[in-house]
A protein has these predicted regions:
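C-terminal substrate-binding/catalytic lobe of Rossmann-fold NAD(P)-dependent oxidoreductases
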Residues: 1-105
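NAD(P)-dependent Rossmann-like dehydrogenase/reductase catalytic/cofactor-binding core
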Residues: 81-145
C-alpha cells in the first residue's frame, strides 16, 4: 500500500516517507487503516473534524467496530454498499502536540473500486467536465455512518 501511495504522490513531484503494514484476517470486512499524519501547522480536533465534514467522499462515524460500520452499509447503502472513499472513526482521532494526528478509518472497497472506476472512465471520456458528471453520485454518499 505504501509503495502504491508513494508512486502516486511521486507523479505530483512529492517524495513522502510512507509506511504501511498489513494483517490478514478471516473476515469479509476489508481495509481498516491506521494513520499517523504530521501536519504543517498546529490545529485542533474540532477543525480537523470540520474539514472532514466538508469532504463529501468522507463519512464520519462514532463507531469503532468494523461489524457495525459495514452492517450499516448493508442496511442503508445503495444495494448494501458504502460508496464513500473512507469512513473516519471520530473516537479514534487523537492530536499530539497540536500537529500529529492519529486515528483509524474504514475504507469500503465498494467506494474505492466503483467510484474510482467511474471517475477515471469519466475523466478519460470527458477530461474537462468529468467532475460535474460524477456529481450525480453525491446522493449515494453518507455524511455519517
Amino acid at each position: 500500500h505504501a509503495r502504491d501511495a508513494f508512486l502516486l504522490f511521486e507523479t505530483l513531484n512529492l517524495k513522502l516517507n510512507l509506511f504501511s503494514s498489513a494483517m490478514k484476517l478471516n473476515t469479509q470486512y476489508m481495509h481498516i487503516l491506521h494513520f499517523h499524519l504530521k501536519l504543517k501547522s498546529p490545529t485542533t480536533i474540532q477543525k480537523i473534524i470540520a474539514k472532514l465534514e466538508k469532504n463529501d467522499r468522507i463519512a464520519l462515524t462514532d463507531k469503532i467496530n468494523a461489524n457495525e460500520v459495514f452492517s450499516f452499509g448493508r442496511d442503508h447503502g445503495h444495494f448494501g454498499r458504502i460508496l464513500n472513499q473512507a469512513v473516519v472513526s471520530v473516537p479514534s482521532l487523537s492530536l499530539i502536540n497540536k500537529n500529529e494526528l492519529t486515528g483509524f478509518c474504514f475504507t469500503p472497497q465498494d467506494g474505492n473500486s466503483i467510484l474510482s472506476s467511474l471517475a477515471i472512465t469519466e475523466w478519460f471520456l470527458y477530461p474537462h467536465s468529468y467532475e460535474s458528471k460524477i456529481q450525480c453520485l453525491n446522493p449515494l454518499f453518507f455524511d455519517e455512518v
